[in-house]
Amino acid sequence: RTRNMRSLPGSHGLGHVRYPTAGSAMNPEEAQPFYVNAPYGITLAHNGNLTNSRSLQREMYALDRRHINTDSDSEVLLNVFAHALQDLGAASKLESMRAHHARVQLSVDEIFAAVSILGERARGAYAVAMQIANVGLLAFRDPFGIRPMCLGFQETDQGTEWMIASESVAIEGLG
């Protein structure tokens, strides 16, 4: 509801209005966006399909020790990305910063490296929007750019507002 959204603090948000891309469309547990709290607090929404979702889910459990709770390929994508950040050594940096009550500082190189790792592991066509807690928004497509992704903005009294969507009609609706 609009009145509920207006009371939320912060200047970033991530939403999804499309049915789940894999699994059961009737299962509310598969509604996007998906969230993991480790290593940083990452939220993901995506449009697309993974062709290796099942095998990647098994691989994530056996090798990466990550349990996927649903049949959604979105949750698989999220965990592949989160694990890549963790493997890049970012998790140890996070623990050090938490101990000193400092904000997490991820480098652009670390984030892009995690996206590259995801692109190497995940097969299929996808457009992804993510929010990393205390860092910001991230958007990317599969390595072949099969799924569309649009970037829009509008100037307001509070500054520039940015929007990422898998179809331009979502942005055009803002005026």
Question: At which residue positions do the language-model features occur?
Answer:
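Conserved short alpha-helical segments that host acidic/polar catalytic motifs at enzyme active sites
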Residues: 1-175
